[in-house]
Amino acid sequence: MKVIFLFILFSLLAGCSSENNKAPSVLSDFIKADYSHNQSIISCELLPDRNLSSVERLIPVFVEKLNKVRKKDDEVMFFFPIQFENSSISKFKILLNHENKVLLEEMHQTLSELSFEETALCNTEETSYGRLSLFESKFESTLAVVEMMECKYVNDFNYATMKLVFEEFIDALAKLDQKVSIVYSENLEIKSNFRWFNIFDSIESRKIFIESWQDLSVSNQMQTLFTEQSSCGASTLYKSYKVI
């Protein structure tokens, strides 16, 4: 699944200017990501005698409580892995895009009040991430297909050395005329770690997007340039339900 990420980024690196050749540490001093939100992920695993219906019944309660404290643009999404085999889903994630810690604290309090530990065991990441939307399409539904990848900059490269790449990326996506959203999320404590999100309205639209991107002549030849700056693990596909 990591192919889509590589095809996207490889093609963009062709547009990098000489500024990317400056020392990465120097660039990072004055080129920083302008995050729109903090991003936190709560990872959960269902207890053996529970199923996703047990979780879905509690979502309206989450929505009611979180709506009382959230900022206007705060978001909460439930991520359920997409499995192509006939197997039950036992793990899921709750992703929060929040302006401050109030939303996250209210989520923890709500989980406790609902005795959610009787349904699933959950752990919140110790570090938050900064969220930056690189490209955004408007989706009519609150349901989406999300492809997430864990990545790491190598050899002291960082966001500053990739900024021009992302700008070229936005231009390339606009020319493709495909409905996709792209989100970059950077670890606020370990800046070399980041996440990449590709967001589609369906599995079929993801397939069409990949085919369209592969048709771009510059995509394949940029693989070496991208791997010089970062490395990524295998991506994971999720069905995303935006509840707030």
What do these predicted ranges mean?
Residues 1-20:
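Classical Sec-dependent N-terminal signal peptides that target proteins to the secretory pathway
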